[in-house]
């Protein structure tokens, strides 16, 4: 999916407003994913998946850091996320549908925390961005 210049601007502006809350939102989105899509828990058998768990918080920060890197390198997602794509495809073997689940939960989390900024245009841009990130992360599965 091609991101237009307006999409890129929307994503950068929204992510800029998230700022220091990115890790917190990443963890919240993970918790939402685990609750809404219980099969996603199978990839984390060694985690304490309870609300506020330090392990979920730490992984939420990793998710946020990866997305921040993607925002910074929005014009070159394949190169920016190549190592992460390798990890998920070859080592972790995460079912690609789980990226869609997490993307949905990220959208819900951002909408809850930033309702005024979460316009239909921003929603569409973020959805396209998360879809592009998911596509890159699953590109090495083939």
From Swiss-Prot:
Gene Ontology process terms (BP): hydrogen peroxide catabolic process
Name of the featured protein: Hemoglobin subunit alpha
Gene (name only): HBA
Binding site for O2: 59
Quaternary structure and interacting proteins, as annotated: Heterotetramer of two alpha chains and two beta chains.
Residues annotated with N6-acetyllysine modification: 17
Gene Ontology MF annotations: haptoglobin binding; heme binding; iron ion binding; organic acid binding; oxygen binding; oxygen carrier activity; peroxidase activity
Keyword Transmembrane: no
């Amino acid at each position: 999916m091609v991101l237009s210049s307006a999409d890129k601007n929307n994503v950068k502006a929204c992510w800029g407003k998230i700022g220091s809350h990115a890790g917190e939102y990443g963890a919240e989105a993970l918790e939402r994913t685990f609750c809404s899509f219980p099969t996603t828990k199978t990839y984390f058998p060694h985690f304490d998946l309870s609300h506020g768990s330090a392990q979920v918080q730490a992984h939420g920060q990793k998710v946020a850091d990866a997305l921040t890197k993607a925002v910074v390198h929005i014009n070159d997602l394949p190169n920016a996320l190549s190592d992460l794509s390798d990890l998920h495809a070859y080592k972790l073997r995460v079912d690609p549908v789980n990226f869609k689940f997490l993307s949905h939960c990220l959208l819900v989390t951002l909408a809850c925390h930033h309702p005024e900024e979460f316009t239909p245009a921003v929603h569409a841009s973020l959805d396209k961005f998360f879809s592009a990130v998911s596509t890159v992360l699953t590109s090495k599965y083939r």
